Amino acid sequence: MLSVWLRVIRVRFLLASVIAVSVGLALTWRQNSSIDPLDAILIFAGVMALHASVDLLNDFWDFKRGIDTKTKRTKMSGGTGVLPEGLLKPSSVYRAGITFLIIGSVIGSYFVITHGIIIGIILGFAILSIYFYSTKIVDSGLGEFFVAVKGSLIVIGTFFIQSGEITIESILGGIVVGVLSSLVLFIASFPDHDADKSKGRKSLVIAVGKEKAAKLFWIFPLISYITIIIGVSANLFPLVSLITLVTIPLMIKSGLGLRKNFDSIENLVPFMSSTLMFSRITGALFVVSFLIVL
């Protein structure tokens, strides 16, 4: 039963939020040479709870709307398959999603009390967007934008809780992380195009079509790379942050693979996986770059 719950929560995709929090903490460490360990633990717990919540509620609503019964599931797309396979009751998944949302909100409320209105604004955005993500947000074509903003706010919020300020470094760091996370959602939406479109969902891929969308792939990594280069050039990021550029070959492999196989689910799966690897490795190297003392 535990394995089923871990599957529906999409544990391996939680790494995106782990990286986002880690970037915020690493930026704080580079600036102040210290972090508050208790606050760091609470931030991780709160962010993980909110991330689990959005995945659970997304699985619930996709099943209720009949999307997951029409998609061809892969390890990267098409939902978790838990509800279509009858492994859990929809009501149980919904209640779990709300429970995690409450847990994350309670932890976030603590930081609102201790750190003020800025965290309150971030928390309010998180709660509303999580609850309405699988209905209002994705139906309006804002899924990729939401994920990018979510990742950015995790970095900014973490840094603010630890340092008491919002800096250009934290904003740029947030952009890097947010766009990398958005890229994973973007490429994973290709196999779900037909099912999503038939049920009224919208995405960037649906808006412009698969062929044109495949050409937009490059925009995401370019934004992240350019942001890092700007940060290094402006002395906001350490020179060693350029280590993230070692993932360029993986990015090129993924982009070319998408361009060639955007309309073939089976052939696209390896390139969805390599895109996930690109995003996570680039993010992890970005974190490490702030911890290396040269």
Regions found by a protein language model. Name each.
Residues 18-24, 146-160, 206-210, 273-286:
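Small-residue-rich segments of transmembrane alpha-helices in multi-pass membrane proteins
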Residues 233-294:
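Extended hydrophobic alpha-helices typical of membrane-associated regions
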